[in-house]
Amino acid sequence: MSLPEFSMRGLLESGAHFGHQAHRWNPKMAPYIFGARNNIHIIDLAQTVPLLHQALKAISDTVARGGRVLFVGTKRQAQEAIADAAQRSAQYYVNSRWLGGMLTNWKTISASIQRLRKLDEILASGAGGLTKKERLMMSRERDKLEKALGGIKDMGGVPDLIFVIDTNKEQLAIQEAERLHIPVAAILDTNCDPDGITYPIPGNDDAGRAISLYCDLIARAALDGISRSQGMGGFDAGELEAPVEDLPPVEGEYEAAPTEIFELLDAPRGAPDDLAKLPGSGPQIVKKLNDAGIFHYWQVAAMTPEDVAKLDHDLKLSGRIERDGWVNQARSLIAS
């Protein structure tokens, strides 16, 4: 097995090149920005490609030496991808909430992990001798600890490298890693601060497809490290995941890429658009859209028929999106 292959086109198709609105940028990210389009910064993927390769090599080398990699991503879009990637590559993860001291106060965290293990044992044995109320309280405590610590309960000590999605949200994790001199590989969107990041990877940290791609590549790099450490002794790590298609490199400017990728957001990027201008919408429907993570015309304009059907079903809009032509109307509002 070798380091996972990827291409600039693959990154483009995942939406990795879309940054935030230009006024929300961090000036320290200027070297990684290609330009702006429709007031959205475009990330320079010509720099992302070699930097991502460097991060993948660092992760593979860390695991090959017997080191541990901790995946960190607690935002909604990243939670599932982070857990799946860590589990596939026999590594560790935090995808719920970063507890203060997870790295710098490992002794206390270890005590909580021991408590989790004890609760698992008691409940697995049937919790004989306990009342129904005691079993219920114990089960709730176990579930709470599992949610917070389940991804690191087998880690056995602080990690040798951490991989982070959204450095703004995971600032506490990065600060703790810095204090312990633990290398950090991180996805850096245009509103992030690259200072203190050992292996910066410029890219969109909100789009679900991009996050899934990053996590898959990191997981496969860790699997490559496992293969190297075991000398491939009958262990075919390549069977554990589907390869990322190696597409031909993209030539020319980024305008050749897809216009937008539909994604849900935790918060608006800058000022939200007036979604009440969409036909048949009103305050209640706008609130439903905002609660679902839709704040801008460009999100609606980027929807595929499958996206329309799913959102209509989830929000119980009775076919309104397609019937009232929201996608075309959103495109018109963007153009006006």
UniProtKB/Swiss-Prot annotation:
Native organism: Beijerinckia indica subsp. indica (strain ATCC 9039 / DSM 1715 / NCIMB 8712)
PANTHER family (UniProt xref): 30S RIBOSOMAL PROTEIN S2 PROKARYOTIC AND ORGANELLAR, SMALL RIBOSOMAL SUBUNIT PROTEIN US2M
Annotated GO CC locations: cytosolic small ribosomal subunit
SUPFAM superfamilies: Ribosomal protein S2 (SSF52313)
Keyword line: Ribonucleoprotein, Ribosomal protein
One Pfam family recorded for the sequence: Ribosomal_S2
Example of a GO biological process term: translation
Protein name: Small ribosomal subunit protein uS2
Similarity field: Belongs to the universal ribosomal protein uS2 family.
GO molecular function: structural constituent of ribosome
